[in-house]
A protein has these predicted regions:
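N-terminal pro-sequences and low-complexity stem/linker regions of secreted or lumenal proteins
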Residues: 1-241
Length: 241
């Protein structure tokens, strides 16, 4: 950008969803480098094993499936209107926690979830440099809306956290920090139902419902007048869907 022009971008928003690979969602997108597979039920029957060890063998032990445009039409619309990354992969070939750490620290000391997801979080905490602390050193603001891995990092443990639902309220009021990490509530995260989850909520894992939640967050940014000065990234934490 020319030095005599101010940067129009004042807000970075990262919306983090759960457990879907590129081919699982966008394998049929026209012109994308994707693969066509069997059409999945919506929601999927259950969450497949996607630990690091499972990743090493899933190509030979499971049937790969995918969703199509009629399941997630707004995601396809975003992909057509903006940018779709078809050579974009999870940082760690494993489950949620390592990749959630990657999103805030660009590093992960683990390749699988800690026992019981380390909830409640206990010691030892990870001594990692992090993007939020780098922002603070530059005098920039940030907020965590619904993310759990922040508490695993020593310098972030105990920092203010906001509920997922707070983001849309703040965005619609035009009150966002410089950088926002936004995580959906469980029933809108698109995370398939855990095989041992006894919940009867029919929305768990429903990708159309999860997409609608994502769209509502984007719409709140527009409502608050922040669209012209914001960049929005929508991503998924791992491939387990």
């Amino acid at each position: 950008m020319p030095q005599n022009k101010p940067n129009p971008l004042q807000h970075v928003v990262m919306i983090v969803k759960e457990n879907h690979s590129f081919d699982n969602y966008f394998g049929t997108f026209p012109g994308a480098l994707g693969a066509k597979m069997v059409h999945s039920a919506n929601p999927p029957s259950s969450d497949p094993d996607h630990r690091h060890g499972a990743w090493l063998t899933r190509d030979k032990t499971s049937v790969r499936m995918q969703f199509i445009e009629k399941d997630i039409p707004d995601y396809f619309a975003y992909a057509r209107q903006f940018v779709l990354c078809d050579r974009y992969f999870t940082d760690v070939a494993g489950p949620s926690t390592p990749n959630h750490l990657m999103l805030i620290a660009a590093a992960s000391p683990i390749i699988d979830n800690p026992p019981r997801y380390r909830l409640p979080v206990g010691t030892p905490l990870y001594n990692l440099p992090s993007l939020p602390m780098s922002l603070e050193k530059k005098g920039l603001t940030w907020r965590n809306y619904g993310g759990y891995a922040f508490d695993f990092i020593q310098d972030l443990h105990g920092k203010p956290q906001f509920k997922s639902e707070q983001f849309a309220q703040d965005a619609a009021a035009g009150n966002l920090p410089h950088v926002s990490w936004v995580y959906a509530p469980h029933d809108a995260s698109e995370h398939p139902a855990d095989p041992i989850d006894k919940s009867s909520n029919p929305l768990i894992g429903n990708v159309t419902h999860g997409m609608a939640w994502t769209v509502a967050q984007v719409d709140a940014i527009v409502k608050g007048g922040l669209w012209p000065k914001s960049v929005i990234f929508i991503t998924w934490d791992d491939w387990g869907g």
